[in-house]
Regions:
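Long, compositionally biased charged/polar accessory segments in the mid-to-C-terminal portions
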Residues: 53, 346-347
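C-terminal accessory/interaction regions of large nucleic acid-associated machines
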Residues: 353, 363-367
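C-terminal cap/substrate-recognition subdomain and adjoining C-terminal extension
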Residues: 96-119, 123-339, 347, 355-356, ...
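Long, low-complexity, intrinsically disordered N-terminal extensions of eukaryotic proteins, enriched
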Residues: 1-9, 14, 46-49, 312-315, ...
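Low-complexity, intrinsically disordered regions enriched in charged/polar residues
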Residues: 30, 41, 54, 58-61, ...
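Alpha-helical substrate-recognition element adjacent to the catalytic core
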Residues: 2-152, 243
């Protein structure tokens, strides 16, 4: 296992609620709420048309394309820095109820004995998300989003992270295993299902469109909860209807995060179910542990009986062929107790069938292993070693 900074499994169940950002928590693309207007002469739609055209022309990731265009259009117009991007983020409008949603849901979970963690998984800009009031108030456990690398003056010089609709899913696995650092290869380590910090059944994914489908599908297939949201002002449900028809989401609701809304009621119901279900899961894994212990004990008992039967058969062997067959079965056994080793040593000295063929390859290998397992030096082991050395 790698030297991972893995978060340990909690004593209480953890429910991870993962959100897209644009049109999920905010009514519009974050870049279109002040930034594009300040650096681009055309309308917002034209900005995206040009950005997508550049991506198509150069076979470029669409997110890299918009990040490049943001920097390019800013030249000679504004000083683009990390701070200015966060300032633009502070202007981003949020859907009703979002401001107090995260802490309110966290407190509801606490009442039910469930730890609630909120995560952003977005193709938008991390810097702008971090500039929002909710992020500054500590709403998010982790923000996974596209971001820039900056020089010592805070000016963007290169993309640091690009999150697109296909690689979004890796962050769900990071959350599942508690390996949150984007560069930590520990996400690839194997963990038994009962050791997952946040099993997929305890992951909620909330999104609005096709770019969320891979995450929604992954969560759905693994027993989690995927929710499609739509703008309550336009009441356009075409996208959520399509996602529901394609089995991408289990539920849909207006993007209204106020107390008592459809979404609020739905998420609280999921929290209630999580609290009850984790009690059952805990009992299941206790039963599984007891079953494994019993199975191992049974295997040990069967193995011990099998070894005794082979020792008795070897002691009574009356032909070389039978002896070789028995030794072949014994070579498959990895562990022998000291008492069993003593019995086997006595047989080698007393049974002429065994003693005579000690120099045969299979018998020789077996008895060398027995002497090593026995680990004691006495007259009997000395005699066996002499017989093995002399080929007699």
């Amino acid at each position: 296992m790698s030297a991972t900074r893995r978060r340990e499994k909690e004593d209480k169940p953890v429910l991870a609620i993962c959100y897209d950002f644009d049109k999920t928590l905010s009514p519009d693309d974050m870049q279109a709420q002040g930034y594009i207007q300040s650096v681009y002469d055309g309308d917002v739609a034209s900005f995206w048309t040009e950005s997508n055209g550049m991506a198509e022309k150069f076979e470029m990731d669409t997110n890299l394309a918009y990040m490049y265009k943001m920097v390019d259009e800013a030249r000679g117009r504004i000083l683009l820095t990390k701070d200015s991007l966060e300032e633009y983020g502070s202007r981003v409008k949020l859907f009703p109820g979002v401001e107090d949603w995260f802490e309110r849901i966290r407190q509801y979970g606490k009442q039910k004995g469930v730890i609630i963690e909120h995560y952003i998984i977005s193709s938008g800009l991390k810097e702008m998300i971090q500039g929002t009031s909710v992020a500054k108030n500590g709403a998010f456990e982790k923000v996974y989003a596209s971001s820039f690398m900056y020089d010592d003056k805070g000016v963007p010089i290169w993309p640091a992270q690009v999150v697109n609709y296909t690689n979004k899913t890796q962050f769900l696995f990071r959350i599942e295993k508690g390996v949150l650092d984007v560069n930590d290869s520990g996400v690839n380590d194997y963990f038994p299902p009962e050791e997952y910090r946040v099993p997929f059944r305890n992951i909620v994914y909330i999104g609005d469109s096709d770019t969320d489908i891979p995450c929604m599908k992954l969560v759905n297939l693994n027993g989690g909860h995927s929710i499609g949201v739509y703008n309550n002002d336009t009441l356009d449900k075409s996208k959520v209807f399509k996602m529901f028809n394609d089995n991408r989401i289990k539920y849909f609701a207006p993007a209204d995060y106020t107390k008592g809304s459809e979404l609020d009621t739905l998420v609280k119901a999921i929290i209630n179910r999580t609290a009850s279900n984790e009690i059952l899961e805990s009992i299941h894994y206790e039963c599984k542990g007891e079953w494994i212990d019993n199975r191992n004990d049974s295997k040990k008992s069967i193995s011990k009986r099998n070894k005794i039967n082979l020792i008795i058969a070897l002691d009574g062997s009356g032909s070389f062929a039978t002896t070789h067959n028995i030794i072949g079965d014994m070579l498959d056994i990895e562990e022998w107790t000291k008492d069993e080793c003593e019995m086997l040593i006595d047989i080698a000295l007393q049974n002429s069938q065994v003693k005579y063929i000690l120099h045969d390859k299979d018998v020789c290998i077996f008895y060398k292993c027995i002497l090593e397992s026995y680990g004691q030096h006495n007259e009997k082991t000395k005699k066996i070693q002499e017989l093995l050395s002399n080929g007699q």
